[in-house]
């Protein structure tokens, strides 16, 4: 039985970041589904509708001269992407049995081995496990597959009966978690067998993430602003469980997906257009960009869905919208107006601080006190 915690506090006391429109990756609506930051932190691979694949700089995402236009030679929609842990290649999952490999060395995008096994199935999710020996694909029909270039695709069995919405693998263990529309949450063990967690089928799960390598847990995000921790049993994955359900009713909109944040955090995407940072180590959620801030900043872009977010440092990174807009964000800087009052305060502080320091030195120095008394007595004479 899951305990549901209603109305937990979400830290939204002040503005967290400043937003700036950098550019767009194209002069038309490219229909970006998602993206992923390479493990080396240098590039971001974007995928989208009608075989769209595009590589951009992670540090200078607004600079179109650094882009690499890729050709997939496919017109099927691409739904997910996952980099290999060594950053040399990435796998792409798409509709109608599409499974592609991007190679960094020559920027080629080619069909992987063994796609005949998934022909006709729409692949919705893909993720490499931490060892980099196998990747897992999930389908809109609920099927789950393991993949390696040597063996191709092998069905895991014990499939879900609804769409796989997300797969995320722990960074220290060869354990992966799975979210679904209506089949609950699952855990894939080291031997590729799937175990479904009881009591999780009643929610609509939109994504899952394992952001903190120091914790033996992941987190699932559900429709209705609901979130739950997945407690991994690293010895026997079938004994993995969930924590208490949390429902963030004070937020506007709804959870739709997530991205990996900086320093072991998750960035939750909300519709229509907002982000929330979740820190699993402290079990704290903080509004990063509110829907009100986004609307005040740009009323047109605020109506577009967030497809991917990444950070190069805490609260410093980029947002990609489904249309292809590139939005940078930086920590919010409070500007102090340079008035006569603030100038007077600064002068007073600059004068008083040295005096306080000298006073403390005098109070703690018997030698200086004796010298002062000697001088004072001489003057009195």
Each language-model region and where it sits:
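Bacterial N-terminal signal peptides
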Residues: 1-8
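Residue-level hotspots at or immediately adjacent to binding/recognition sites across diverse folds
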Residues: 12-381
């Amino acid at each position: 039985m899951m305990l549901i915690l209603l109305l937990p506090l979400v830290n939204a006391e002040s503005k967290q970041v400043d937003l700036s429109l950098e550019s767009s990756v194209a002069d038309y609506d490219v229909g970006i589904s998602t993206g992923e930051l390479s493990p080396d932190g240098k590039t971001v691979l974007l995928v989208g509708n009608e075989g769209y694949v595009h590589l951009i700089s992670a540090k200078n995402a607004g600079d179109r001269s650094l882009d690499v236009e890729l050709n997939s030679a496919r017109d099927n929609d691409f739904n997910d992407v996952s980099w290999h842990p060594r950053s040399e290649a990435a796998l792409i999952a798409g509709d109608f049995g599409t499974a592609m490999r991007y190679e960094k060395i020559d920027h080629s995008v080619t069909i992987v081995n063994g796609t005949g096994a998934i022909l006709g199935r729409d692949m919705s999710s893909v993720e490499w496990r931490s060892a980099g020996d196998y990747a897992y694909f999930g389908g809109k029909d609920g099927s789950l597959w393991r993949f390696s270039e040597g063996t191709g695709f092998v069905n895991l069995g014990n499939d879900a009966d609804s769409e796989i919405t997300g797969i995320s693998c722990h960074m220290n263990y060869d354990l992966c978690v799975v979210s679904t529309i209506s089949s609950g949450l699952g855990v894939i063990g080291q031997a590729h067998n799937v175990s479904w967690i009881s009591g999780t089928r009643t929610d609509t799960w939109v994504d899952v993430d394992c952001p903190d390598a120091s914790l033996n847990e992941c987190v699932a995000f559900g429709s209705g602003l609901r979130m739950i921790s997945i407690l991994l049993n690293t010895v026997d994955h079938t004994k993995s469980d969930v924590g208490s359900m949390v429902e963030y009713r004070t937020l506007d909109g709804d959870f739709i997906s997530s991205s990996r944040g900086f320093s072991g955090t998750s960035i939750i995407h909300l519709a229509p257009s907002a982000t929330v940072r979740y820190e699993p180590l402290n079990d704290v959620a903080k509004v990063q960009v509110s829907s009100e801030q986004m609307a005040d900043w740009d009323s047109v872009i605020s109506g577009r869905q967030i497809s991917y977010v990444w950070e190069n440092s805490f609260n410093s990174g980029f947002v990609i919208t489904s249309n292809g807009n590139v939005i940078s964000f930086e920590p919010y800087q409070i500007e102090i107006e340079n008035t006569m009052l603030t100038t007077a305060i600064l002068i007073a502080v600059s004068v008083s601080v040295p005096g306080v320091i000298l006073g403390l030195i005098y109070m703690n120095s018997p030698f200086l006190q004796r010298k002062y008394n000697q001088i004072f007595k001489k003057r009195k004479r």
